[in-house]
Swiss-Prot record:
The gene is btuF. This is Vitamin B12-binding protein. Disulfide bonds join 183-263. Residues 1-17 form the signal peptide. InterPro entries: ABC_Transporter_SBP, ABC_transptr_periplasmic_BD, ABC_transptr_vit_B12-bd, Vit_B12_bind_prot. Residues 23-270 form the Fe/B12 periplasmic-binding domain. It is found in: Periplasm. It comes from Photobacterium profundum (strain SS9). Part of the ABC transporter complex BtuCDF involved in vitamin B12 import. Binds vitamin B12 and delivers it to the periplasmic surface of BtuC. Coiled coil: none annotated. The keyword Metal-binding does not apply. The lineage of its organism: Bacteria, Pseudomonadati, Pseudomonadota, Gammaproteobacteria, Vibrionales. Cyanocob(III)alamin binds at residue 50. Pfam families: Peripla_BP_2. Belongs to the BtuF family. Keywords: Disulfide bond, Periplasm, Signal, Transport.
């Protein structure tokens, strides 16, 4: 009897987990994109600030931002699935939502493969899981093609600037270092013990990067690096580039666009065409 009871309990839990989610809330921009990629777009009823892709996401009610989440409003919306960013959304507020019995799915992509895996996992909540499977498989195929293409390329040293004041960069193992690594880049601060270290201008100059990358949030073309003319290879060779921030910093299918952009720039640096 005990075996039968356990079997019924496990089977019931499995069945519930596979039921399509009808009311979904996303608490970060990247989980919003992943939801659409997994076929959950029609089920989304609210999202976080800066959830701006695809265009349909811009019409969703806002229930989260960098300061936290609107707990009372989220509960009132009665979601059957909440998509959260592990490490990005406040743990205490997430715990409260779980204590209230709400179903919270945590996304925390670390490797490029994690994007495809997360899409497949979210697809289990979609009425059309085949969309998630197809999207994930296509992503894996494109990643595999880039790996094959770049495996014998010359390594290019680079510095990626997240912000101007203070100067923040990324270490190996932190998103989006995987994109640069796939394209044959060597992070000059890859060995930092901090995931997102704060560095000085002098530290960057000492490590002599061939390329400096920034985003529109850190306008490297007209910033401090131009003051180091003659001392920085990246500046002397005009290898200071601005990348599309959302492609690069959000772990979503659009990461492929970031890979194409970064790999293309590295190729031109290697070939001497820039």
């Amino acid at each position: 009897m005990r075996f039968i009871y356990l079997f019924i309990a496990l089977f019931s839990s499995f069945s519930i987990a596979q039921q399509p989610a009808l009311r979904v809330i996303s608490l970060s921009p990247h989980t919003t994109e992943l939801a659409y990629a997994a076929g959950l777009g029609d089920a989304l009823i609210a999202a976080s600030d800066y959830s701006d892709y695809p265009e349909a996401a811009q019409k969703l009610e806002r229930v989260a931002n960098y300061r936290g989440v609107k707990l009372e409003r989220i509960v009132a919306l009665q979601p059957d699935l909440i998509l959260a960013w592990k490490g990005g959304n406040p743990p205490r507020e997430m715990a409260k939502l779980e204590q209230l019995g709400l179903n919270v799915f945590y996304s925390n992509p670390v490797e490029l493969e994690d994007i495809a895996t997360t899409i497949e996992q979210l697809g289990q909540y979609s009425p059309e899981p085949t969309q998630a499977i197809q999207t994930a498989n296509q992503f894996r195929q494109e990643i595999s093609a880039f790996k094959t293409r770049n495996e014998n390329q010359r390594t290019v040293s680079f510095f990626y600037q997240l912000s101007d004041s203070p100067i923040i960069t990324v270490a190996d193992g932190s998103w989006p270092s995987q994109v640069f690594s796939l394209c044959g880049g060597r992070n000059i601060f890859g060995d930092s013990p901090a995931a997102y270290p704060q560095v000085s201008e002098e530290q960057v100059v000492v490590r002599q990067p061939e390329v400096i990358f920034g985003t529109p949030h850190a306008d490297t073309k007209t910033s401090i690096w131009q003051n180091w003319q003659g001392k920085l290879p990246a500046v002397d060779n005009h290898h200071v580039f601005t990348l599309q921030a959302d492609w690069l910093n959000r772990p979503t299918p659009r990461t492929i666009n970031a890979i194409k952009q970064v790999c293309g720039l590295f190729d031109q640096v290697r070939d001497g065409t820039l």
